[in-house]
């Protein structure tokens, strides 16, 4: 479906209701909320209604794992919310309840929206204020940041079947495989494919620094293990994860200094594959159903006697 979204002229998104049977508000028999108005003398005051970004983020559609690639990969999106219609492409966004001439929204050559207007909602997150997925103009590090930011956002979504954890993201992972600084992944943990294996290993080690955002001791909200997927990957857990991404330093350096001496994987046959072998033969890991599930790290050991605490 990733190729379908990327090449479609327009994606119609139903961000209203709780299931696929709800329909599109304002179309046929599906009602939508009326725009409130008041007249004071000869002045008519209209409600601008709830901002569509808020409506989209709080919709059932935004909680579903399979719709993430629809949001991220589509070139043009026409979104139906409970109140109004919202449009967003990779250059601008506008919505029905506020009428602004398009000439005033755009820069002089009409190539993009003026920077003073609010950025779009798709692809935008706490680490990337403007979510345009123009990956070919980015450095190898910035592509890595965008990849991990996408993982963070996707991990907060829900899936009916645990084994869909990576399948529902396959359109996005293939997008990152085709850019100038190409990235592959092992169980959802990315590394650059266009560099020597030692540097690729450093990036992979940084991918391993993900953490749960929910308290593991909270009996209700704690992360849940996904059967059949490795525990060392975010894909092996249901629940939002976070990565310590540095996006505002202006320095394209990895934030985690890798002291790992070696990274390898153990297959079901007990055969050991070095990380360099995985990089040299990417077909080994692209079919994740048969990928090695055991991760082996060789690292320096810090003895417990090196730590002290105030009792």
Map each language-model feature to its residues.
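Feature captures the RNA virus RNA-dependent RNA polymerase
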Residues: 1-311
């Amino acid at each position: 479906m990733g190729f379908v979204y990327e090449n479609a002229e327009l994606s119609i998104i139903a961000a209203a209701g709780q299931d696929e049977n709800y329909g599109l508000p304002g179309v046929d028999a599906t009602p939508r909320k009326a725009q409130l108005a008041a007249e004071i003398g000869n002045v008519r005051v209209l409600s601008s209604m709830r901002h569509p970004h808020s409506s989209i983020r709080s919709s059932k559609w935004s909680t579903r794992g399979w719709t993430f690639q629809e949001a991220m990969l589509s070139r043009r999106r026409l979104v139906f919310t409970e109140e109004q219609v919202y449009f967003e492409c990779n250059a601008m966004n506008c919505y029905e309840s506020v009428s602004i001439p398009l000439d005033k929204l755009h820069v002089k050559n009409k190539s993009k929206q003026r920077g003073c207007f609010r950025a779009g909602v798709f692809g935008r997150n706490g680490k990337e204020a403007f979510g345009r997925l123009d990956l070919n103009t980015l450095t190898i590090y910035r592509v890595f940041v965008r990849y991990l930011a996408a993982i963070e956002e996707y991990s907060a979504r829900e899936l009916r079947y645990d084994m869909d954890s990576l399948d529902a993201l396959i359109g996005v992972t293939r997008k990152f495989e085709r850019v100038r600084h190409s990235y592959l992944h092992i169980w959802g943990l990315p590394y650059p494919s266009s560099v020597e294996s030692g540097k690729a290993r450093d990036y992979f080690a940084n991918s391993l620094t993900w953490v749960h955002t929910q308290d593991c001791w909270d009996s209700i909200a704690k992360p849940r293990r996904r059967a059949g997927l490795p525990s060392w990957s975010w894909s092996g857990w249901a629940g939002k994860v976070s990565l310590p991404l540095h996006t505002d330093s202006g320095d394209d350096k990895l934030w985690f200094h890798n002291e790992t001496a070696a990274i390898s994987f153990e297959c079901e046959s007990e055969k050991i594959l070095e990380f360099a072998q995985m990089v040299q033969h990417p077909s080994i890991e692209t079919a994740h159903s048969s990928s090695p599930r055991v991760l082996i790290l060789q690292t320096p050991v810090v003895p417990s006697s090196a730590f002290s605490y105030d009792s």
